[in-house]
Amino acid sequence: MTTTSAKPTSEANPPNKRGADYLSQRPFLSCGEIGTEYGLQRPKESLFHRNFMGMCENARRKTSAVFGGLSMVYEFCAENFERVPAAIDAGARRIELCDNLAVGGTTPSAGVVSATTNYAHEHDARVMCMIRPRGGDFHYNQDELRMMEMDLGLAVSAGVDGLVFGCCKPCAGGWALDELTLGALVMAAGCATEECKREPIDITFHMAFDQLSPEAQLDAIDILADCGITRILTHGGAAGTPIEDNFENLARLIEYAGDRLTILPGGGISTVNRDTVAAALGVSELHGTKIVPLEV
């Protein structure tokens, strides 16, 4: 995808118009350019960044208040609604809602999002909605980005507790974090919550993270934390490898992230090894399709 950096607005104040019309016309912004749009030299001090970080902190406090009695948060990766009730009954307190798990998960339909969110909230569980327009790689063109912005707006208006997305771009020797697309999606999420006048949402950066080199992963943690991302879902190594083989790298990522964001281990975690993984890594959140006991 070829994009150009946004130019600072010539207006004294940022545009007030929000929503689909504004998003369809606004230029792409990297995380570093979000502050520039608001006429500030330091992105960390931008009005949007302060508000968004404050909203994320409030969301974390709310999570602690609601589920503070639980020692672990098991996030069940669901393909549509079918197994959500059973997963919640089995102890899942957070649902990552997807479609098409055969290709790694794509955006579920608006009807599925609404029904799942309503059910989960009635049963003291939270919903993270996947925002991914297709399978394959995580490098999106401008049309796909617009689709993602519209989809996340619909998900926020349906009441989801968080969004799950990720984006990379080709670089010499592999993949790099796509800061322009990331910035646009983070901005769209913030605009959507403001427009709906609702409580803040979490954002998980999904396993696109695992496409990055070990060195690039540390740089990505800095950028993602700076953007207000809540957590990173990662297997810690190549897909298909036993997660136990990735403990060393996962521990490295957890230590580096500190309290800036949560490293959420996933992939190859089940009821058989979840306690071992949690103890080895010292984590309180785990993700998977087999993370809670379900009948086959």
Q: Where does each model-flagged region fall?
A:
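Positively charged N-terminal leader segments that act as targeting/secretion signals
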Residues: 13-29, 59-60, 64-65
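Hydrophobic faces of well-ordered beta-strands that scaffold small-molecule active sites
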Residues: 74-76, 95-97, 127-131, 163-165, ...
